[in-house]
């Protein structure tokens, strides 16, 4: 039986750079690369990938290039003899470290694991086997550092157990969470899962502290790694490192149509469909064609109703994983997209793009009728109804239609009697927030509307508008009976009562009684005209 069948080996998760790509990385990025390699190795080790048969050769002993041509498989930094896993602190780890070029170190220098502090033996020279006694005890409480000498030694104390990031340069202090293996029983207990790390949030248990620490980021929403090229944040350094290849890697496959380049040929092939219009995937249910298989698969769920992705927090189901990931940010509070102008964070990239138009002043949506420009497509859609007269929102109670949904919601309170806005001073309730704001000025005495002519201030805008007619001489309300004009509509209404009373008296045909009361009518007429002129 093949013991390696179905296993994930280090080669499967390794990330490689060409010499040119390696040259583009700064010191922090190179250290991060080492961090990622250590994380991957620690994870594989925790799964038992290198604790098999005695004669099984560690995959890393075959060697691999990390962008420095002098350091290759033909020149291994450790002994080429096979080393049993129980005799070292993890042979694959040594090969990784010795192949990473440290900034400021000559390519011929190498990086080794320092076992002097770990296992109380002197530093070994290049090519010598590193071994330990039977009664080894890792000292988890010590502070270790990177030794810069002819050979570079990196302490990987408890490398299988601790997160790789804590071992890179210097342990910050005693790791009380992780206990040393005092004897064989302790080591076996850890491997059998008896000493687990339990998550206090969801109750999950982990045998590897690295996995435990990484898991906790799901609950905290922590994204420690920020790309200084595009501002994206990443939860795990491995994902961050993979993303950075987008900026540093060569794009050798170029589209002849638009000049766009791609890292992989299959991506170029997919892209070409944009120009050719090819849509090879057809839906048998509705006959629609799709450019990409992933889009086709998602579309089919519309017909089947399948929602295979479930949110563990609220139990909601989603058609695709990307929608689930976006939804989960509601629970975690994660906002991975940052605006470089104002520092604001956003949950979705589409929201960031919309927001950035505030800074750029971009208004990409133009009305084809009047030429007005809008920042958002939704604003253009609403504006378009001014030209079409469309009123898509209809009240089910009275049949009245409205142009905007918010107007329908406001209107429906007339039927329901709902008055959701309460004055904290007098307890009065109002149907609309605007009415509450106006009412509040009765308590505060605020008069925000001032007349530019005389300086008089008013609490409501409509009172100011009527007042300004005194200065302008405008009399927009005219009596149809006698053509007299008035400043306010209320004045016209009162005036029109004079004419209605006259008609009433005439219709009664009281004869001489009309002659007896002209004075009273004249006085009333005079009084009304005096008041409302």
Swiss-Prot record:
<feature type="zinc finger region" description="C2H2-type 1">
    <location>
        <begin position="197"/>
        <end position="219"/>
    </location>
</feature>
<feature type="zinc finger region" description="C2H2-type 4">
    <location>
        <begin position="281"/>
        <end position="303"/>
    </location>
</feature>
<keyword id="KW-0677">Repeat</keyword>
<comment type="function">
    <text>May be involved in transcriptional regulation.</text>
</comment>
<dbReference type="GO" id="GO:0000978">
    <property type="term" value="F:RNA polymerase II cis-regulatory region sequence-specific DNA binding"/>
</dbReference>
<feature type="zinc finger region" description="C2H2-type 3">
    <location>
        <begin position="253"/>
        <end position="275"/>
    </location>
</feature>
<feature type="domain" description="KRAB">
    <location>
        <begin position="8"/>
        <end position="79"/>
    </location>
</feature>
<dbReference type="InterPro" id="IPR001909">
    <property type="entry name" value="KRAB"/>
</dbReference>
<dbReference type="InterPro" id="IPR036236">
    <property type="entry name" value="Znf_C2H2_sf"/>
</dbReference>
<dbReference type="InterPro" id="IPR050527">
    <property type="entry name" value="Snail/Krueppel_Znf"/>
</dbReference>
<keyword id="KW-0479">Metal-binding</keyword>
<dbReference type="InterPro" id="IPR036051">
    <property type="entry name" value="KRAB_dom_sf"/>
</dbReference>
<feature type="zinc finger region" description="C2H2-type 11">
    <location>
        <begin position="477"/>
        <end position="499"/>
    </location>
</feature>
<feature type="zinc finger region" description="C2H2-type 10">
    <location>
        <begin position="449"/>
        <end position="471"/>
    </location>
</feature>
<feature type="zinc finger region" description="C2H2-type 5">
    <location>
        <begin position="309"/>
        <end position="331"/>
    </location>
</feature>
<feature type="cross-link" description="Glycyl lysine isopeptide (Lys-Gly) (interchain with G-Cter in SUMO2)">
    <location>
        <position position="516"/>
    </location>
</feature>
<feature type="zinc finger region" description="C2H2-type 2">
    <location>
        <begin position="225"/>
        <end position="247"/>
    </location>
</feature>
<keyword id="KW-0805">Transcription regulation</keyword>
<dbReference type="Pfam" id="PF01352">
    <property type="entry name" value="KRAB"/>
</dbReference>
<dbReference type="InterPro" id="IPR013087">
    <property type="entry name" value="Znf_C2H2_type"/>
</dbReference>
<dbReference type="GO" id="GO:0008270">
    <property type="term" value="F:zinc ion binding"/>
</dbReference>
<feature type="zinc finger region" description="C2H2-type 7">
    <location>
        <begin position="365"/>
        <end position="387"/>
    </location>
</feature>
<feature type="zinc finger region" description="C2H2-type 8">
    <location>
        <begin position="393"/>
        <end position="415"/>
    </location>
</feature>
<keyword id="KW-1017">Isopeptide bond</keyword>
<comment type="similarity">
    <text>Belongs to the krueppel C2H2-type zinc-finger protein family.</text>
</comment>
<protein>
    <recommendedName>
        <fullName>Zinc finger protein 548</fullName>
    </recommendedName>
</protein>
<feature type="zinc finger region" description="C2H2-type 9">
    <location>
        <begin position="421"/>
        <end position="443"/>
    </location>
</feature>
<keyword id="KW-0862">Zinc</keyword>
<keyword id="KW-0539">Nucleus</keyword>
<dbReference type="Pfam" id="PF00096">
    <property type="entry name" value="zf-C2H2"/>
</dbReference>
<feature type="zinc finger region" description="C2H2-type 6">
    <location>
        <begin position="337"/>
        <end position="359"/>
    </location>
</feature>
<dbReference type="GO" id="GO:0006357">
    <property type="term" value="P:regulation of transcription by RNA polymerase II"/>
</dbReference>
<keyword id="KW-0832">Ubl conjugation</keyword>
<dbReference type="GO" id="GO:0000981">
    <property type="term" value="F:DNA-binding transcription factor activity, RNA polymerase II-specific"/>
</dbReference>
<dbReference type="GO" id="GO:0005634">
    <property type="term" value="C:nucleus"/>
</dbReference>
<keyword id="KW-0804">Transcription</keyword>
<keyword id="KW-0863">Zinc-finger</keyword>
<keyword id="KW-0238">DNA-binding</keyword>
């Amino acid at each position: 039986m093949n013991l390696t069948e179905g296993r994930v080996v280090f080669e499967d998760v390794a990330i490689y750079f060409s010499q040119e790509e390696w040259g583009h990385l700064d010191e922090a990025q190179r250290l991060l690369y080492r961090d990622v390699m250590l994380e991957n190795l620690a994870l594989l080790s925790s799964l038992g990938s290198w604790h098999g048969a005695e004669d099984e050769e560690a995959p890393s002993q075959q060697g691999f290039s990390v962008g420095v041509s002098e350091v290759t498989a033909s020149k291994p930094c450790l002994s080429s003899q096979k080393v049993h896993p129980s005799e070292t602190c993890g042979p694959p780890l040594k090969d990784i470290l010795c192949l990473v070029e440290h900034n400021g170190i000559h390519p011929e220098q190498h990086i080794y694991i320092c076992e002097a502090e770990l296992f109380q033996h002197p530093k070994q020279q290049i090519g010598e086997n590193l071994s330990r006694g039977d009664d080894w005890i890792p000292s988890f409480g010590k502070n270790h550092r990177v030794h810069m000498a002819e050979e570079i030694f990196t302490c990987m104390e408890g490398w299988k157990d601790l997160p790789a990031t804590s071992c890179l340069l210097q342990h910050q202090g005693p790791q009380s969470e992780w206990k040393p293996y005092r004897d064989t029983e302790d080591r076996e207990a850890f491997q059998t899962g008896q000493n687990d790390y339990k998550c206090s949030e969801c109750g999950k248990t982990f045998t590897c502290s690295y996995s435990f620490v990484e898991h906790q980021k799901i609950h905290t929403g922590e994204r420690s790694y920020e790309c200084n090229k595009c501002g994206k944040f990443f939860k795990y350094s491995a994902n961050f490192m993979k993303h950075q290849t987008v900026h540093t890697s060569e794009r050798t496959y170029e589209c002849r149509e638009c000049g766009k380049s791609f890292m992989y040929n299959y991506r170029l092939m997919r892209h070409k469909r944009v120009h050719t219009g090819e849509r090879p995937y057809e839906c048998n249910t509705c006959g629609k064609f799709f450019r990409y298989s992933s889009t086709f698969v998602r579309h089919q769920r519309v017909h089947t109703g399948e929602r295979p992705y479930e949110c563990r927090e609220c139990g909601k189901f989603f058609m695709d994983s990307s929608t689930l990931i976006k939804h989960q940010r509601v629970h975690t509070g994660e906002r991975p997209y940052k605006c470089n102008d104002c520092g604001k964070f956003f949950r979705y990239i589409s929201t960031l793009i919309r927001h950035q138009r505030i800074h750029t002043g971009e208004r990409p949506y133009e009305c084809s009728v009047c030429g007005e420009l809008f920042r958002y497509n939704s604003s253009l859609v609403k504006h378009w109804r001014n030209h079409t007269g469309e009123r898509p929102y209809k009240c089910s109670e009275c049949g009245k239609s409205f142009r905007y949904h918010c107007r329908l919601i406001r209107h429906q309170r007339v039927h329901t009697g709902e008055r959701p806005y309460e004055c904290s001073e007098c307890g009065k309730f109002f149907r609309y927030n605007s009415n509450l704001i106006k009412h509040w000025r009765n308590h505060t005495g605020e008069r925000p509307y001032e007349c530019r002519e005389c300086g008089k201030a008013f609490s409501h805008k409509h009172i100011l508008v009527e007042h300004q007619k005194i200065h302008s001489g405008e009399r927009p309300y005219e009596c149809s009976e006698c053509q007299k004009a008035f400043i306010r509509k209320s004045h016209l209404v009162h005036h029109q009562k004079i004419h209605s009373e006259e008609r009433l008296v005439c219709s009664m045909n009281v004869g001489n009684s009309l002659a007896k009361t002209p004075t009273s009518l004249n006085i009333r007429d005079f009084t009304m005209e005096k008041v409302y002129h």
